[in-house]
Amino acid sequence: MAKLGYKVEADPSKTAKAMGRTLRISKKHALEICREINGMKLETAVSFLNRVLALETPVPFKVHNKDVPHRKGKIGTHAGRFPQKATEEILKVLDNAKKNAEYKGLNTEKLRIKHISSNKGFIIKRFMPRAFGRASPKYQETIHIQVILEEFY
C-alpha cells in the first residue's frame, strides 16, 4: 500500500493530525461534510455533526445536488441531506484528532479545523454470481479522510 501524506504542511507544535483510511462511506457525502465543517471550531463542528445525526440540521449539498430534495431552515442552499454513515465516521476521525491534541498538550477548547479533506481510496472488488454460471462485478469504493487541528489564540 502506498504511503499517504497530508496535503497541507503544518507546524507540529501547534497542530494535531488524524487520518481515517479505507472508510466505507460515500465519497460524495464525505466531500460535502468536509467542505461544510472546514475552518470551524472543533466544538462547533462536533455539535453540528451531532445535530445531523439527530436529523435536526441537514448538510447542504452544493456540488452533488442533483435530485436532492429541499430542506427547510437556513442552510445556505436549498438542497440538503442527512448522511448518517459518513457523519459517524468523520466524528470518529475528529475524536482521534482531539485525543492526539490532548496527548501533545494543546488546549482542546481552542482548536479549529485547519484542514479536512476526503481522498479516494482503493476499490474493493467483488463478484455477484448470476444465472448460467456468469458473474457481475460489484465494486466498493473506499475513502481516506485527513484532519489537521490547529490551536488558535
Curated annotation (Swiss-Prot):
Protein's GO biological process: cytoplasmic translation
Molecular-function GO term, any one: rRNA binding
InterPro entries named among the record's database cross-references: Ribosomal_uL22, Ribosomal_uL22_CS, Ribosomal_uL22_euk/arc, Ribosomal_uL22_sf
PROSITE patterns, sorted: RIBOSOMAL_L22
Keywords attached to this entry: Ribonucleoprotein, Ribosomal protein, RNA-binding, rRNA-binding
Keyword Nucleotidyltransferase applies: no
SUPFAM superfamilies: Ribosomal protein L22
Ribonucleoprotein recorded as keyword: yes
GO cellular component term, pick one: cytosolic large ribosomal subunit
Family listed: Belongs to the universal ribosomal protein uL22 family.
Functional summary from the UniProt entry: This protein binds specifically to 23S rRNA. It makes multiple contacts with different domains of the 23S rRNA in the assembled 50S subunit and ribosome. The globular domain of the protein is located near the polypeptide exit tunnel on the outside of the subunit, while an extended beta-hairpin is found that lines the wall of the exit tunnel in the center of the 70S ribosome.
Description of how the protein assembles with itself and partners: Part of the 50S ribosomal subunit.
Official protein name in the record: Large ribosomal subunit protein uL22
Provenance organism: Methanococcus vannielii (strain ATCC 35089 / DSM 1224 / JCM 13029 / OCM 148 / SB)
